[in-house]
Amino acid sequence: MAVVFLLVFLSTECWGFSADAFLRASVATGIPVELLLAISHVESGFHPHAINVSGRPFLPYSEYEALGLLKRSGDNVDIGLMQVNWGYWGNKFGLSKSELLDPQLNVLVGAKILEHCVRASGSWWKGVGLYHSPESFRQRAYVEKVWRSYRLVLTKMGT
């Protein structure tokens, strides 16, 4: 019931996208929905059109605006709710930049990347760090942010 409440809350708060993307990705990969929500909160603030071009964040108001920005960006671009790096992961999944703007697909790809990172590291939280960066000093700060967000998600869900 708590998951349903949070998903309804998100669907009304998050630019109208269907928040069940997180639940579907969780079911498909085994990654806890709460962890996916926490990562998305840290990565994009639940903004489905969030784009980061070479370290510079943008929050386009519309998909149209986001597509224009993506056309002008190079390969080093993070896209969508889960800030999937297109230069690295786009080719591995055979996806275009515009495809990664789809919230359902973006969250699923992010969950699959996290699943890969968890397997590679052997730990949930090491996997979270690896999701962000292969460099350990960047991982620690990121894991702390996600941990705080994760606790917030759990609080909102009443668990």
Language model features with spans:
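N-terminal signal peptide c-region/cleavage motif recognized by signal peptidases
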Residues: 10-13
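Bacterial N-terminal signal peptides that target proteins for export
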Residues: 1-2
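Catalytic glycan-binding domains that act on GlcNAc-containing polysaccharides
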Residues: 15-159
